[in-house]
Amino acid sequence: MNYISIKDIDSLSKWVKSAIKIKKDPLKNKKLGKNKTLGMLFFNPSLRTRLSTQKAALNLGMNVMVMNFTNEGWTLEFEDGAVMNSGASEHIKEAAEVVSQYCDIIAIRAFAGLVDKEKDYQETVISGFLKYATVPIVNMESAIRHPLQSLADAITMEEFKPRHKDKPKVVLSWAPHPKALPQAVANSFVEMMQLQKDMDFVITHPEGYELSPEITKDCTIEYDQNKAFENADFVYVKNWSNFNDYGKVTNSDPNWTVTAEKMALTNNGKFMHC
């Protein structure tokens, strides 16, 4: 089984319940990964995802190997049929097969370039390893998804949701940022919320900052941030760059910054952020 999207799992509620049990006794399954190796390949930097994934593997008794392709390893070519006479030193076909020989699971982190939308949404790096690797692939944040983060968010909401409400209200709110940021975290949060049958979900952002319509299909969109925050139990705040004017910062309105006054509109809501 590959884990590329939160929708790859068979039951979100079952996975969340299992994760909460594991948190209470993280070394309970320390022999599960005996004689198995996790290979972690980083095409972009990481702090929390790297540490938490590596720690989880060690808790399961796995060996862990890490490669940072920013300053280690060869530059890879991902286009099939490409003539290897330019900057790339090795083709993904051979690289994925080699890594598969030494690893039982391959975890990959490769961000969006935020220049070519079509290329990013084709998930060039992840797709290349999926095609040629012979072992399971885990997504540690790709061009358009971050399913480990969204699973962790689902766990947090289960732990802190109000028990007196049948359907807690969750808001995903855009907020300004000086840099152009990927849509991966927001996309995966939306996909996770689409699996939550017992929660109300609203996305709020400035007009023109819609996420991919394929991702947000059937979601409630509210362009009035204050209205969206009313009676919310969770407010998840994240910036993402423009999807239509791809990768651009077309709005930096400070009025979209989340403040204590805005949180006062919520139902004593929990503030979440990645």
Predicted segments, located by residue:
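Positively charged, low-complexity intrinsically disordered leader regions
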Residues: M1-L51, K55
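Phosphate-coordination loops involved in phosphoryl transfer and adenosine-cofactor binding
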Residues: L32-L38, D166-K169, N268
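Glycine-rich phosphate/diphosphate-binding loop of Rossmann-like nucleotide-binding domains
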Residues: F43-M65, E158-K238
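Short glycine-rich anion-binding loops that position phosphate/pyrophosphate groups of nucleotides
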Residues: F111-G113, P176-P178, N239-F243
